[in-house]
């Protein structure tokens, strides 16, 4: 993102994201713009290698171009996330779970939360909960469950049921089409539908907002990593 930075000077070739100056420690702009650049590189390579048709390529680019409007749509409901933050800002630990791309986003959500609020948080692959992780869940533990992918949705719902059986309070993050999450989670945050490969760009927004609002309610006034 920064022209002339150390990493740019050390690289043979550079693709700048042009996100502008990043003021916050959390660097949310850099994360979002880097995702977009990766999408564009992947689409270009898939097109050149003949892995997707011209129509699929055009549709994918169109979906990328629609992301800003969908992010704006999520931001219209930011008060809902603020409400959830007001309920859970005093938690001792908060866990994030997800599968596949949702797991990758859960890592970012957990990082942002502990980075700016200093609350202990960890992200785990939902399919590995039984390998010791579930023993950390107790009555009142907040678990943020990401379930946006169609193929793995039911499996993640099963994981939600497992942690709830241990006494967890679950905040589900899913797409508008997955209504079943409302039946198993205590709270649900919905994001607009898009191409499945682009979902991380939308899923991360409510997690970033959650970390931000928890930070306002909980954190000490001076950054520890400044």
Positions of the model-derived regions?
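Active-site phosphate/pyrophosphate-binding segments
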Residues: 11-142, 220
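Flexible glycine/proline-rich, aromatic-decorated loop/lid segments
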Residues: 1-27, 32-35, 175-191
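Conserved small/polar residues in nucleotide/adenosyl-binding loops
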Residues: 218-225
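Glycine-rich, anion-gripping cofactor-binding loops and their flanking helix/strand elements
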Residues: 128-164, 194-208
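Short glycine/serine/threonine-rich phosphate/pyrophosphate-binding segments
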Residues: 7, 102-107, 152-157
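Structural motif
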Residues: 98-99, 146-149, 175
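Short internal beta-strands
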Residues: 170-174
């Amino acid at each position: 993102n920064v022209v002339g930075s150390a990493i740019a000077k050390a690289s043979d070739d550079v693709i700048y994201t042009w996100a502008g100056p990043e003021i916050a420690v959390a660097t949310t702009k850099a994360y979002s713009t880097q995702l977009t650049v990766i999408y564009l590189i992947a689409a270009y390579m898939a097109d050149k290698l003949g892995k997707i048709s011209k129509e699929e390529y055009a549709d994918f680019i169109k979906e990328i171009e629609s992301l800003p409007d969908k992010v704006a749509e999520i931001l219209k409901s930011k008060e809902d996330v603020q409400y959830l933050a007001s309920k859970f800002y005093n938690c001792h630990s908060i866990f994030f779970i997800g599968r596949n791309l949702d797991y990758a986003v859960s890592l970012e959500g957990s990082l942002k939360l502990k980075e700016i609020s200093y609350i202990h948080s960890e992200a785990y692959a939902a399919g590995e909960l039984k390998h010791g992780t579930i023993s950390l869940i107790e009555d009142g533990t907040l678990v943020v469950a990401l379930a946006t992918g169609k193929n793995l949705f039911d499996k993640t719902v099963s994981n939600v049921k497992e942690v709830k059986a241990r006494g967890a309070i679950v905040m589900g993050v899913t797409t508008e089409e997955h209504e079943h999450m409302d039946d198993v989670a205590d709270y649900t945050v919905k994001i607009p539908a898009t191409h499945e490969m682009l979902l991380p760009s939308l899923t991360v927004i409510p997690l970033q907002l959650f970390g931000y609002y928890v930070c306002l309610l909980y954190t000490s006034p001076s950054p520890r990593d400044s």
